[in-house]
């Protein structure tokens, strides 16, 4: 089992990574030395089918546990599900020494974390991610639900008390979900670690990754994010660099319809555009075409659906929470392994997006 500490201005907590460590969950929770009266286990429906009974039994040997099953997919991050979970918590007579555990992917973690942040003005919560994508979202304390007008518009910064990452659970992931999660690993390399990026570039497929390779990628990705969050917990500075690929990525997700394209595929499209902007605006020296072809070779899409018009996408991007005074903060690369931001107007963004889309479909 690997262990690292995430330290922020407001808290510090352990991240445990290893195969089969879900079976040690009760012992790991006890080692935190937190008062714990009850557990609300918030679990993804598909994860519940595979591991729900086992996890309930393991925890229920030590504490009273109530299981709440949430839908798989982005639709779970709704105000309706948020209210349902809070109702379950109240009916279970949870108090301020109770705990919520998120057992699922990033969606489950976002939802459970926001519920914990707001129940009785904040109770403990634990992240138990079950997807590769969640290696990113489980660390750093961003929790939220969606609004019909945009993703993650209702949320908070609220750190978990621990992250328990059982990599054995990744073995049941379909290739599409593995690829989705790998996009965030690649993002971390692009913005913060050239040597790690060079290592990733040696992989021409995501099939057949060994447990050791996955564990190392997860550890490296979380280490990079932890270092960023340590310096900037609430996205007032360099934490914004973690949004590399996400400005367009979130717009693509919204226009395709949540669940119609994976988060990772959308972010990969966003990174391809961000590489183009890095070249055009930040004068980043790189072999962009080669990097783009590598991403496509791993199975990521190389262009956005033609029926989605550029002005619609640029309007979505300008509605991003990083927009200030008619300018949106866009993350680019100064060089491979080092990020910076730039401010773009709607016209500049639209012009760059038009040129990139014409190039990608040429």
From Swiss-Prot:
Residues the entry annotates as binding Zn(2+): 184, 246, 263
Q: Which cofactor does it need?
A: Co(2+); Zn(2+); NAD(+)
Entry keywords, A to Z? Amino-acid biosynthesis, Aromatic amino acid biosynthesis, Cobalt, Cytoplasm, Lyase, Metal-binding, NAD, Nucleotide-binding, Zinc
Pfam families, alphabetized: DHQ_synthase (PF01761), DHQS_C (PF24621)
Pathway stated in the Swiss-Prot or TrEMBL entry: Metabolic intermediate biosynthesis; chorismate biosynthesis; chorismate from D-erythrose 4-phosphate and phosphoenolpyruvate: step 2/7
Enzyme Commission number(s) from the entry:
4.2.3.4
Signal peptide residue numbers: none
Q: Cellular component per GO?
A: cytoplasm
Instruction: Give the cofactor note text.
Output: Binds 1 divalent metal cation per subunit. Can use either Co(2+) or Zn(2+).
One biological process term from GO is: aromatic amino acid family biosynthetic process
Reaction catalysed by this enzyme? 7-phospho-2-dehydro-3-deoxy-D-arabino-heptonate = 3-dehydroquinate + phosphate
Q: What is its main location?
A: cytoplasm
Concerning InterPro entries, the annotation shows: Dehydroquinate_synthase, DHQ_synth_AroB, DHQ_synth_fam, DHQS/DOIS_N, DHQS_C
What GO molecular functions are on record for this protein?
3-dehydroquinate synthase activity; metal ion binding; nucleotide binding
- Where in the cell is the protein located? Cytoplasm
Please list the residues that bind NAD(+): 72-77, 106-110, 130-131, 142, 151
**Similarity section:** Belongs to the sugar phosphate cyclases superfamily. Dehydroquinate synthase family.
Mind telling me which HAMAP family this protein's record contains?
A: DHQ_synthase
Looking up PANTHER family in the UniProt record yields: 3-DEHYDROQUINATE SYNTHASE, 3-DEHYDROQUINATE SYNTHASE, CHLOROPLASTIC
Q: What does this protein do?
A: Catalyzes the conversion of 3-deoxy-D-arabino-heptulosonate 7-phosphate (DAHP) to dehydroquinate (DHQ).
Q: What is this protein called?
A: 3-dehydroquinate synthase
């Amino acid at each position: 089992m690997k262990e690292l500490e995430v330290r922020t201005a407001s808290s510090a907590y352990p991240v445990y990574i290893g195969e089969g460590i879900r079976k040690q969950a009760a012992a790991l929770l006890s080692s935190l030395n937190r008062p714990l009266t009850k557990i609300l286990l918030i679990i993804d429906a598909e994860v519940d089918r595979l591991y729900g009974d086992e996890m309930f039994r393991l925890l229920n040997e030590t504490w009273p546990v109530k299981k709440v099953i949430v839908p798989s997919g982005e639709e779970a991050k709704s105000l309706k599900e948020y209210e349902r979970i809070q109702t379950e918590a109240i009916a279970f007579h949870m108090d301020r020494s109770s705990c919520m555990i998120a057992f699922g992917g990033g969606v489950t973690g976002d939802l459970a974390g926001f519920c914990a942040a707001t129940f009785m003005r904040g109770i403990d919560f634990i992240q138990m991610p079950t997807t590769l994508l969640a290696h990113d979202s489980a660390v750093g304390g961003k929790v939220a639900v969606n609004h019909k007008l945009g993703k993650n518009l209702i949320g908070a910064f609220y750190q978990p008390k621990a992250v328990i990452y059982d990599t054995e659970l990744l073995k049941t992931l379909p290739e599409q979900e593995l690829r989705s999660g790998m996009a965030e690993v690649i993002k971390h390399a692009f913005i913060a670690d050239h040597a790690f990026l060079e290592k990733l570039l040696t992989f021409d497929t995501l099939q057949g990754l060994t447990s050791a390779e996955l564990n190392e990628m997860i550890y490296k990705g979380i280490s990079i994010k932890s270092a960023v969050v340590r310096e900037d917990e609430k996205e007032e500075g360099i934490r914004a660099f973690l949004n590399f690929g996400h400005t367009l990525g979130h717009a693509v997700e919204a226009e395709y319809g949540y669940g119609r394209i994976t988060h990772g595929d959308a972010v990969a499209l966003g990174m391809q555009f961000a590489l183009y902007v890095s070249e055009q605006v930040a004068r980043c020296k790189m072999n962009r075409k080669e990097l783009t072809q590598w991403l496509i070779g791993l199975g990521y899409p190389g262009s956005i659906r033609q029926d989605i018009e550029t002005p619609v996408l640029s309007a979505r991007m300008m509605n991003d929470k990083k927009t200030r005074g008619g300018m949106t903060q866009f993350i680019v690369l100064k060089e491979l392994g080092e990020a910076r931001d730039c401010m773009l107007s709607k016209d500049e963004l639209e012009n760059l997006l038009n040129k990139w889309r014409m190039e990608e479909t040429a």
